[in-house]
Amino acid sequence: MATKAVCVLKGDGPVQGTIYFELKGEKTVLVTGTIKGLAEGDHGFHVHQFGDNTQGCTSAGPHFNPESKKHGGPKDQERHVGDLGNVTAGKDGVATVYIEDSVIALSGDHSIIGRTMVVHEKPDDLGRGGNEESTKTGNAGSRLACGVIGITQ
């Protein structure tokens, strides 16, 4: 069973980063890392369905959602498995990621291994935007950078 994973984020522009995933205890996955080249502010941060980046980040498909739920925030009961909320970049364009999540997993039905991590252009409205797109994507906009999540030591 995997206890650690890593993802290298790259895109067509300057946004890049490395994200680490580590199982802590039985269910909690600690997500850490750094993303550079972002505009200042919040950016949607999600695990997408497929580990396919052949057409850039768009071929990664929708948010990872094995339970067919509506989009939500990371603390919501009603959320996609892949909904990790937002990362926040400072004036220097760097976002330091620190998320503890008990919905994603590194094995089993909620495993994110082999799926794509995506950082988006806009803030995720956490499903509270009042329109249909909000319940699917959080109105987070285009995909700035992505990478496939793989097992590591």
From Swiss-Prot:
The keyword Zinc applies. GO terms for molecular function: copper ion binding; protein phosphatase 2B binding; protein-folding chaperone binding; superoxide dismutase activity; zinc ion binding. It is found in: Cytoplasm; Nucleus. Its EC number is 1.15.1.1. Its cofactor is Cu cation; Zn(2+). GO terms for biological process: auditory receptor cell stereocilium organization; embryo implantation; glutathione metabolic process; heart contraction; hydrogen peroxide biosynthetic process; intracellular iron ion homeostasis; locomotory behavior; muscle cell cellular homeostasis. It comes from the Eukaryota. Palmitoylation helps nuclear targeting and decreases catalytic activity. Succinylation, adjacent to copper catalytic site, probably inhibits activity. Desuccinylation by SIRT5 enhances activity. Binds 1 copper ion per subunit. Residues 66-80 have a biased composition (Basic and acidic residues). Destroys radicals which are normally produced within the cells and which are toxic to biological systems. This is Superoxide dismutase [Cu-Zn]. It comes from Sus scrofa (Pig). The gene is SOD1.
